């Protein structure tokens, strides 16, 4: 479908992938800073630097990019989620030890901004499962996801101003678009942390759960999304992102063309027939 070409093809060939089966979970190894698990149709990527509060080093960033590419390229994966290990932090930001000597050339590299863009442009739905601190670059990774789910103990901030810099991973552009200009400016300029309740109120997150319910909720959402016709979530993503960056009239026109394209699919016929016959649809992505 031409209108789905809005998403760039960032997938690549990944080698040295080894599968390990354990209690229904498939674990893809060969990573040092992250974990990659398949749970049904869900690809769960876990930042695993607990002693560093899951701070995102350059090597961690490289692995995250690889993991997203693996999930995007895997036909068995329908939903992608990112979380943090340890129960105290999603990601406390970039690894500051690597920021100290960062020069202009390095500052202009995509770094976290590139990962967030990759998550945003991946046709498959992406979730950020947040438990604990979600700060700086960690928040910017979460902002690149389609949905953000958090536990009650989670806190959010863009504290870069206290370090004499500004966010460089996309927060100045994405945060105001997600929470509005007022709260976007509040969080960016003040740099103060907000709690999960406030994050829910302003739309930074859309679901708030107890800590022991975070993974079950992510799995439940993934199962729900996996039951949809494959073209639906990817087209919905394309429409929303295009609509946010275009005129209302242009977005409405493209929506009509997108609807027209989906109406011609076999999945549309299956969906309507299943509804009329009061049965569960069997979508094939055709």
Language model feature labels by segment:
Residues 45, 49, 64, 82, ...:
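Terminal peptide-recognition signature
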């Amino acid at each position: 479908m031409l209108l789905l070409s809005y998403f760039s093809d960032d997938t690549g060939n990944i080698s040295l992938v080894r599968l390990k089966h354990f209690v229904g979970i498939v674990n893809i190894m060969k990573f040092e800073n992250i974990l990659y698990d398949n749970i049904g149709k869900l690809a769960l990527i876990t930042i695993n630097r607990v002693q560093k509060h899951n701070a995102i080093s350059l090597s961690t960033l490289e692995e995250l990019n690889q993991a997203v590419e693996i999930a995007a390229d895997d036909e068995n994966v329908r939903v992608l989620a990112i979380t943090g290990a340890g129960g105290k932090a999603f990601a406390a930001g970039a690894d500051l030890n690597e920021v100290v000597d960062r020069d202009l050339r390095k500052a202009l590299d995509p770094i976290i901004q590139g990962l967030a863009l990759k998550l945003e442009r991946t046709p498959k739905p992406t979730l950020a499962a947040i438990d604990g601190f979600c700060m700086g670059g960690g928040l910017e990774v979460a902002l690149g996801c389609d949905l953000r789910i958090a536990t009650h103990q989670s806190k959010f901030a863009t504290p870069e101003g206290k370090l004499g810099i500004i966010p460089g991973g996309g927060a100045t552009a994405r945060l105001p678009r997600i929470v509005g200009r007022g709260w976007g400016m509040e969080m960016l300029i003040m740099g103060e942390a907000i709690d999960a309740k406030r994050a829910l109120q302003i739309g930074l997150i859309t679901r708030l759960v107890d800590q022991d319910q975070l993974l079950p909720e992510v799995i439940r959402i993934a199962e729900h999304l996996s039951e949809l016709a494959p073209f639906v979530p990817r087209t919905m993503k394309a429409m929303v992102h295009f609509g946010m960056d275009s005129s209302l009239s242009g977005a409405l026109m493209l929506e009509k063309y997108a609807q027209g394209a989906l109406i011609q699919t076999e999945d549309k016929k299956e969906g309507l027939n299943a509804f009329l016959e009061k049965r569960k649809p069997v979508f094939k992505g055709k």
